[in-house]
Amino acid sequence: MRLHAFTLLSLLGLVPSFAAASLSGSVGPLTSASAKAAKKTCNVLDYGAKADKKTDLGPPLAAAFAACKSGGLVYIPAGDYAMSTWVKLANGKAWALQIDGVIYRTGTDGGNMIMIEHTSDFELYSSTSSGAMQGLGYEFHASNNWSGPRLLRLWDVSDFSVHDLILVDSPSFHFSIDTCSNGEVYNMAIRGGNHGGLDGVDVWSTNIWIHDLEVTNKDECVTVKSPAKNILVENIYCNLSGGCAMGSLGADTDISDITYKNIYTWNSNQMMMIKSNGGSGTVSNVVFENFIGHGNAYSLDIDSFWSSMSAVSGDGVTLNNITIKNWKGTEANGAQRGPIKIICPDKVPCYNILIEDFAMWTETGSKQWYSCQSAYGSGFCLKSGSHHTSYAVTTTTVSSAPSGYSAAKMASDLSTDFGSTKSIPIPTIPTSFYPGATPYSALMSKQSTKAAKARAVDMSVETPAAASRSEQVVQGAPQETGQSAPESAGPVPSGNPGPVPTGGSRPSRHRHGHHHFGSAI
């Protein structure tokens, strides 16, 4: 009998069984970045790039990609780079992009600064965990212009990972994952302006694992759009953000098998929202588990008549088999915006909605409410029964706090936002994203430091000749013999690539960091 890897791990108690409904197979690149670098390394400095914050990085990056697109590593060393023309890096296979420098937007065109498309076996990362794209969006926003370029977009990319990267102050969206498959996104910090339309991560794809991210903005934190299937989102820190969501949903919505787990939301618009206004299609098999919130306007907000979007033709999007489990914390004002709002279409009521172990309380006043409309299931204001007919809004008001609502806070909760008219500083990637949860993978910078210390111990007992050879390897480029790129404690001298990743550390790791979920073993 063949067993599925994820099923076996669930039986062993290593991962929660509900997650098996989220990921359908392996995620991540098929070959390691070290193998790619050993095949060929294309340093943008060799193609005309200069770390002078003036010379346009666009053409050198495109040229380096052209040389390595069939297998290799494109390397942007540490330093400050200007980018005034955007790049579309298409039809690559078995390649990686290592960004150890900071890319500053200097152009004003729309579109996407970096677009990766029609690509397989791909990895985008910073070996120092400090590589960044600085969009300088405030230069647009100060004049009320919200239609500038997006920072990063992946389209039709399979078997990939993006990690240890920082995205800052996009003029528009920060990171879009469009019609991709088998991907892993982790260990990132995204910091945007305090305004709508500056989304953190938007994903409409299949079999994607997004984990260990911090997002600061005032729109989407990590949001699933349609169509999407088999998405697992966990260990997310929405730190003064818009909050996580699904939508906006319109005609022919097709979303299923989605799990959000370990989501911490601070001083944001909502902890989780499903938003639509008319439309058609379905959202099914969804789990929202282990949510902690403090100071948010809304907590659970399912709104099928969301007034911030124009009405779409159709009876509404059908929601079914939605589980909301283990929510704790406080909302800003429960009398104004209660912690449970489930407003479903009258013509296609929601059904099989389960709310359990839900304890939230107001930070202002001594009352809060729960509100439901045309919604069926179990818990709070939901109606029971198998005959799903429409019903008007029902609201229950309570004046005593539920037991067990107290929840931990994060030490890095921001006290103020970054506005939208001044330069936003580049943050560091945190090492904690949810209270008590350890990230699945250490930052590349931490792995580098550990490796450097190990080398120091090794060299202390080597002969002088051996130590000399070790030093040459550390400072040299990947060898033509297929040797992996060396690990280091930071940027490697002479513009050579630093350490290359081997993927995260979730149980059942497949070859070359390609995480294995659900496939037969």
Swiss-Prot record:
The keyword Signal applies. Residues 1-21 form the signal peptide. Its EC number is 3.2.1.171. Residues 469-486 have a biased composition (Polar residues). One of its GO terms (molecular function) is polygalacturonase activity. Pfam families: Glyco_hydro_28, Pect-lyase_RHGA_epim. GO terms for biological process: cell wall organization; pectin catabolic process. It is an enzyme of class 3 (hydrolase). It comes from the Eukaryota. Its main location: secreted. GO terms for cellular component: extracellular region. Residues 507-521 have a biased composition (Basic residues). Transmembrane segments: none annotated. Residues 462-521 are annotated as: Disordered. Belongs to the glycosyl hydrolase 28 family. Pectinolytic enzymes consist of four classes of enzymes: pectine lyase, polygalacturonase, pectin methylesterase and rhamnogalacturonase. Hydrolyzes alpha-D-galacturonopyranosyl-(1,2)-alpha-L-rhamnopyranosyl linkages in the backbone of the hairy regions of pectins. This is Probable rhamnogalacturonase B. It comes from Aspergillus fumigatus (strain CBS 144.89 / FGSC A1163 / CEA10) (Neosartorya fumigata). The gene is rhgB.
